[in-house]
Amino acid sequence: MPPPQQGPCGHHLLLLLALLLPSLPLTRAPVPPGPAAALLQALGLRDEPQGAPRLRPVPPVMWRLFRRRDPQETRSGSRRTSPGVTLQPCHVEELGVAGNIVRHIPDRGAPTRASEPASAAGHCPEWTVVFDLSAVEPAERPSRARLELRFAAAAAAAPEGGWELSVAQAGQGAGADPGPVLLRQLVPALGPPVRAELLGAAWARNASWPRSLRLALALRPRAPAACARLAEASLLLVTLDPRLCHPLARPRRDAEPVLGGGPGGACRARRLYVSFREVGWHRWVIAPRGFLANYCQGQCALPVALSGSGGPPALNHAVLRALMHAAAPGAADLPCCVPARLSPISVLFFDNSDNVVLRQYEDMVVDECGCR
């Protein structure tokens, strides 16, 4: 069902989003004031990204992670979890680690690599790959760093014993020798992507983030054979930002909340659809196209405050205030209609470094309202 037409202008939607999203202290230079800047700050962005980079498709792993978390995808029939099973907040089930930010970071090294010469004694060239980590905030804690390599084999058949992959810290200057080897692993075949876990090898779990990660790679056949060519390198980085992770956060419900219509009536959630196209962010927000933010509106007078109006029961304090207001209107104000149940959303977008980022934001959707 297409989203309903909205009356508020884009500026009002930006202001609403800026109020909904958490305000995070950044260590970088302050951004200009205003609703748009406040929302960009909450998204962890210094400036508004320019849009999707040319010839930069969204990696399939990022689509899979997003679709598993998006409630619209699960309701449309592409459910990746069993009915009744809820996703643990601030946890990436597919990778088995804690986290609420997933980045797919491409290699910023040489854009093209020439074919490698044949090797008669296992001596093959090395490659240097560079990953830009400048967008990672100091408060983020790494939980997984997976190097993924795709090779174009010069020979159809794998050498006897396969290949050996070695990863070392690359030297900083031109012609500088690489540092000590961080890891070695056997690669039996080059058809599927070659993956190597770097966390604990490239840097310690509690170490400060480098601005970039430079690695020297070598793939040597264990028997005389032609060398392979490195076609693509990327880093899948999962981090946990505790500022965006609520210990008591509730998972998103599968069913849509019961929403009210007009402004009158009892306290309940009212429908509000926020479109990223309306605010001009569709060029760099990959998915979703928008989301139901909703808002609370309605009366909390008796008997609504006693019944809970179909939502959660009102607090005893709210009932007491409603009783006092009914007996003596000047003695106490009516309770307020406020969110009683909130749920998160996941946003897939390009950041300022053209990385594909999947980020979860808590308390973005009003599911239920109550008198407080």
Curated annotation (Swiss-Prot):
Its main location: secreted. Glycans are attached at residue 206. Expressed in the brain. Residues 67-86 are annotated as: Disordered. Residues 30-253 form a propeptide. Disulfide bonds join 267-337, 296-369, 300-371. Residues 1-29 form the signal peptide. It comes from the Eukaryota. GO terms for molecular function: cytokine activity; growth factor activity. InterPro entries: Cystine-knot_cytokine (IPR029034), TGF-b_C (IPR001839), TGF-beta-rel (IPR015615), TGFb_CS (IPR017948). GO terms for cellular component: extracellular space. Keywords: Cleavage on pair of basic residues, Cytokine, Disease variant, Disulfide bond, Glycoprotein, Growth factor, Secreted, Signal. Pfam families: TGF_beta. It is found in: Secreted. GO terms for biological process: endoderm development; in utero embryonic development; mesoderm development. Changing residue 68 to H: Found in a patient with atrioventricular canal-cleft mitral valve; uncertain significance. Belongs to the TGF-beta family. It is linked to Conotruncal heart malformations: A group of congenital heart defects involving the outflow tracts. Examples include truncus arteriosus communis, double-outlet right ventricle and transposition of great arteries. Truncus arteriosus communis is characterized by a single outflow tract instead of a separate aorta and pulmonary artery. In transposition of the great arteries, the aorta arises from the right ventricle and the pulmonary artery from the left ventricle. In double outlet of the right ventricle, both the pulmonary artery and aorta arise from the right ventricle. Congenital heart defects, multiple types, 6: An autosomal dominant disorder characterized by congenital developmental abnormalities involving structures of the heart. Common defects include tetralogy of Fallot, transposition of the great arteries, double-outlet right ventricle, total anomalous pulmonary venous return, pulmonary stenosis or atresia, atrioventricular canal, ventricular septal defect, and hypoplastic left or right ventricle. Homodimer; disulfide-linked. This protein is produced by a bicistronic gene which also produces the CERS1 protein from a non-overlapping reading frame. May mediate cell differentiation events during embryonic development. This is Embryonic growth/differentiation factor 1. It comes from Homo sapiens. The gene is GDF1.
